[in-house]
Amino acid sequence: MVSNFDFLKKDFPVLSNFGEMAEKYCYSDSNSCLMKLGMIGETIVNLMFTYDRIAFPHDNTAVARIDKLSREGLLTSDLVAILHGLRKVRNKAVHENYASIADDKTFLPMAHSLCEWFMQTYGDWNYSHKDFVMPEENTVLGTVDKEAEEKKESELTKLAEQMAAAAPIIEQTERKKQAYKAANQRPKTEAETRFLIDEQLRMVGWDADTENLRYSKGTRPTKGRNLAIAEYPTNSKVGNRGYADYALFVGEKLVGIIEAKAIHKDIPSVIDYQGKDYPRCIRKEDEKYVIDTWGEFKVPFTFATNGRPYLEQYKTKSGIWFLDLRKPDNSPMALRGWMSPDGMEELLAADIEGKNKNLKEMSYDLLTDKDGLNLRPYQLNAIRAAEEAVISGKQTALLAMATGTGKTRT
């Protein structure tokens, strides 16, 4: 069998070996597969320190090393998530004898993609992506001499460190530029996107696990839990046979729908299509979770993302896009992070229309009074323009005023 990791043999044989062994163990020895995949992440992190002559952190743990490389600007948030995912699953495999063929299939393509990024950043800058092919189920590894295997891995790791230490020093600005370019061009599957979304949701307080917290596995809204339930059924006829990628529940209240897409998709168009259709098509048996209706919608908030951090230059193909369905004139907007369960409840409780009404009716007496701020007409016009931007739902506004015209007072 040709390994997906063969492209590493010349420049990084240690990574090629770990990847090939992980593929061979995938179905016959999942525990060993996950350990090999974890070693890919650990080896890449250690080699990055050596190639770039970066001092290891004082608290020289795996977490601290990954975090330092992130602070140095060498790792994007999606790569950090993959490295931590590989680290965590390896720890479970080592310390709990954990095994899961489903996790093998999740992490194998992600480890391959990570290796492609590493090749493009620390090896051949002109390397071109090759699609990952999942090993066939009849791939079985024969009798393995574990002692000989460990000896080979140790020798290859030592060789890799020697090669990294002897490599020409690349200017840090050039390395960061190449690392960013390779990360930005790295293809992501919907499975990886889901993995990244799970991580991001957990960080802000949601219980999220696409593989286990699924409707088909019996997960249901539960009092006291903030659940992101994967593959939630609706009556929609569009998309994934009517299954929303995630339904968000604060306790037993249905507050949001998430649609996850591959990186090449235009995200706002997903909001307008599946993102709006799923909230229209909530099943009758799920109406007990509906907190209100807004026209044809039975869910207040809808989201779409591809797991990619928000980039202004790739505005419609990055970030988390959000639409508040409670008002028909609301437009989709890009967020830089997920809303927490508390944040959603606060937004639901906020009387935005009432506050906008108060803002419109607020007197300008203090602003115009000679004993007050005594603002000039152009300053009042600037304030009115800013208020209009707020009332219309804009997230940003820019006031341009010349030097000496009272910007601070305005």
Features from the language model and the residues they span:
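ATP-dependent helicase/translocase motor core
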Residues: Q120-T410
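Amphipathic alpha-helical interface elements
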Residues: M1-E153
